[in-house]
From Swiss-Prot:
Protein name (Swiss-Prot/TrEMBL): Enolase
Keyword Phosphoprotein found: no
Pfam families: Enolase_C (PF00113), Enolase_N (PF03952)
Gene Ontology process terms (BP): glycolytic process
Keyword Cytoplasm found: yes
Cited Gene3D superfamilies: Enolase-like C-terminal domain, Enolase-like, N-terminal domain
UniProt similarity note: Belongs to the enolase family.
Lineage, opening ranks: Bacteria, Bacillati, Cyanobacteriota, Cyanophyceae, Oscillatoriophycideae
Keywords of this entry: Cytoplasm, Glycolysis, Lyase, Magnesium, Metal-binding, Secreted
Cellular component aspect of the GO annotation: cell surface; extracellular region; phosphopyruvate hydratase complex
Residues binding (2R)-2-phosphoglycerate: 168, 340, 369-370, 391
Organism this protein belongs to: Microcystis aeruginosa (strain NIES-843 / IAM M-2473)
Entry EC no(s): 4.2.1.11
Record-listed Mg(2+) binding positions: 247, 288, 315
Length: 432
C-alpha cells in the first residue's frame, strides 16, 4: 500500500541542540509538500563500541570543547538536502540509501551518522504524520501491539557515573507484571525503596547519566545485594516478579588481555566463571557485554556456559551492525542484540538488523544512549518491531521518563489489543 503513496519532500532543516549531558547534538525537520512535518533528535553514547558508525563532531576547541555538531548541520543543508528534495517520503529505504551513497564511506564518516540518522528519522515521522498515524503503527503495521518489558537501570557505574563501581548498569526487570503500566509502577516502587536503602547506609543518592543512583560500593556484588533487598522492601519477589539484569560493559575495563574489576586483574576464563557465579547466586536473567568487544573466543566460552540459561546481549560486540551480528550468529555467540539507532545511523539499516536477528532466533533489545533528548522514537520502535524489551534508563530524569510515558500512552491507545511482552514469550531470552 505505501509503495503507491507519493508525497515529495519539500524542505529539510537541521540545527544544533543540547542533549541531557549539556553536549551538542543534532535535530532535523523534514517538511512534506502536503504540509506534514517530522522532527527528530539524535542521542549520543558515553561508552561506545569501536565499530559504531561515525558521529561527526566539529573538533573546534573554542566551542563546546570540540563537541559541537555544526559540521553535521552544514552537511544536512549543503549535501543531504540537494539529494533528498523532491524524493517520495514514503520510500524510506531509497531515502536512506541515497544518503548512504552520498556519504560514500563504510562508517558514514563523510556526512556523519548523526546527520544521516536525524534526517532518516524525521522523514519517517513526517510520513507517519501525513497519514495521521502514530509512528509505531506506520513502521509496524496492524500487528504492532506488544509493549516491551523495561530494563530499568537503577544503579549506574562504569562510564555512566563518577563512582567506583566497575559494571556499568545494574537493572531491574519487572517480568511478572500483567501490563506495561503495572511493570512501570513496580519499577518505580523498587527505585524508591532503593533510594531509602542507600540513604539508610549513608550512601550517596545522586544519579548518573541514565538516572540511576551512583553510590560508591564495596563491590559489584554489593550492588546486586542492595537490589534484592530493595525488591523485597517494595513488596515483590526477586526473580519471579522482578528479575535482575546487568550491562557489564567489559570493554571499558579490559587491559592487555585482562579484566580489571573489584580492585584486581582477572583472566578471561576467570571473568566467565565470575559471571556464572553471579547467575548462580542472584536472579540474573540478562547480561550485556560480559566480555570485550573483540574477545570472540571467550564470548563463545561465555555463551556455551550461560547461553542456554540466560539472555546474553551484544552491544559493543555487535553495534547494531548486520555484519557483526552475522559473525556472532555464525560463531554461535550470544543470543540477543542491543539495538541503538545511532550505532548504525539510519532507520532502514536498524530495521534490517532487527529482522536479521529475528530470523536467527536472536532477541532485540531497543536501547537509548547515555546522552539523550526528549525524542521518544525508541518507544515507538520497540512497539513497531514487537521487540519485547526496551532499555531507556531509570525512573528519574525527564529524558528517560519521556520514553516510559510515551509507552504508557501507546498502551492506552491500543486498549484491549495491547500485550505485555513477557505474557507472550517476547521478553528476555532465558530458559532457567
Amino acid at each position: 500500500m505505501l509503495d503507491k503513496i507519493e508525497v515529495p519532500i519539500e524542505a529539510i532543516a537541521a540545527r544544533e541542540i543540547l542533549d541531557s549531558r549539556g553536549r551538542p547534538t543534532i535535530e532535523a525537520e523534514v517538511l512534506l509538500e502536503s504540509g506534514a512535518l517530522g522532527l527528530a533528535q539524535v542521542p549520543s553514547g558515553a561508552s561506545t563500541g569501536s565499530f559504531e558508525a561515525h558521529e561527526l563532531r566539529d573538533d573546534d576547541p573554542q566551542r563546546y570543547g570540540g563537541k559541537g555538531v555544526l559540521k553535521a548541520v552544514r552537511n544536512v543543508h549543503e549535501k543531504i538536502v540537494p539529494v533528498l528534495e523532491g524524493m517520495n517520503a514514503f520510500d524510506q529505504a531509497s531515502i536512506d540509501l541515497a544518503m548512504i551513497d552520498r556519504d560514500g564511506t563504510a562508517n558514514k564518516r563523510e556526512l556523519g551518522a548523526n546527520a544521516i540518522l536525524a534526517v532518516s528519522l524525521a522523514t519517517a515521522k513526517a510520513a507517519a504524520a501525513d497519514l495521521g498515524l502514530p509512528l509505531y503503527r506506520y513502521l509496524g503495521g496492524p500487528m504492532a501491539n506488544v509493549l516491551p518489558v523495561p530494563m530499568m537501570n537503577v544503579i549506574n557505574g562504569g562510564s555512566h557515573a563518577d563512582n567506583n563501581v566497575d559494571f556499568q548498569e545494574f537493572m531491574i526487570f519487572p517480568i511478572g507484571a500483567d501490563s506495561f503500566k503495572e511493570g512501570l509502577r513496580w519499577g518505580a516502587e523498587v527505585f524508591a525503596a532503593l533510594g531509602k536503602a542507600l540513604h539508610e547506609r549513608k550512601l550517596l543518592t545522586g544519579v548518573g547519566d541514565e538516572g540511576g543512583y551512583a553510590p560508591n560500593l564495596a563491590s559489584n556484588q554489593e550492588a546486586l545485594d542492595i537490589l534484592i533487598e530493595s525488591i523485597e522492601r517494595a513488596g515483590y519477589k526477586p526473580g519471579s516478579q522482578v528479575a535482575l539484569a546487568m550491562d557489564v560493559a567489559a570493554s571499558e575495563f579490559y587491559r592487555d588481555g585482562q579484566y580489571i574489576y573489584d580492585g584486581s586483574a582477572h583472566s578471561p576464563a576467570e571473568m566467565v566463571d565470575f559471571l556464572a557465579s553471579l547467575v548462580e547466586r542472584y536472579p540474573i536473567i540478562s547480561i550485556e557485554d560480559g566480555l570485550h568487544e573483540e574477545d570472540w573466543d571467550n564470548w563463545k566460552l561465555l555463551t556455551d556456559k550461560l547461553g542456554a540459561r540466560i539472555q546474553l546481549v551484544g552491544d559493543d560486540l555487535m553495534v547494531t551492525n548486520p555484519i557483526r551480528l552475522q559473525k556472532a550468529i555464525d560463531l554461535g555467540i550470544a543470543n540477543s542484540i542491543l539495538i541503538k539507532l545511532n550505532q548504525i545511523g539510519s532507520l532502514t539499516e536498524t530495521l534490517q538488523t532487527i529482522a536479521l536477528a529475528t530470523r536467527h532466533g536472536y532477541r532485540s533489545v531497543i536501547s537509548h544512549r547515555s546522552g539523550e533528548t526528549e525524542d521518544t522514537t525508541i518507544a515507538d520502535l520497540a512497539v513497531a518491531t514487537n521487540a519485547g524489551q526496551i532499555k531507556t534508563g531509570s525512573l528519574s530524569r525527564s529524558e528517560r521518563v519521556a520514553k516510559y510515558n510515551r509507552l504508557l500512552r501507546i498502551e492506552e491507545e491500543l486498549g484491549d489489543r495491547a500485550v505485555y511482552a513477557p505474557k507472550v514469550g517476547l521478553g528476555p531470552k532465558f530458559l532457567a
